[in-house]
């Protein structure tokens, strides 16, 4: 690896380290929203099946 590639890699790792907590928080929120959406769809299916 050249020194330029090393510098780019170091900068990239620095950015990743800075973003890691934000990404973790966002992942938790997205996971929660996805689970909520799936549960809503399942409940809607069940209720739809009952009423139809």
Swiss-Prot record:
The chain crosses the membrane at residues 11-31, 32-52. GO terms for cellular component: host cell membrane; membrane. The keyword Lipid biosynthesis does not apply. It is a multi-pass membrane protein. It is found in: Host membrane. It comes from the Viruses. Keywords: Host membrane, Membrane, Transmembrane, Transmembrane helix. This is Transmembrane protein ORF52. It comes from Acidianus filamentous virus 1 (isolate United States/Yellowstone).
């Amino acid at each position: 690896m050249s020194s330029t590639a090393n510098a780019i890699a170091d900068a990239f790792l620095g950015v990743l380290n800075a973003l890691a907590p934000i990404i973790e928080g966002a992942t938790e929120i997205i996971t929660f929203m996805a689970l909520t959406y799936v549960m809503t769809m399942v409940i809607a299916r069940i209720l739809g099946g009952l009423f139809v």
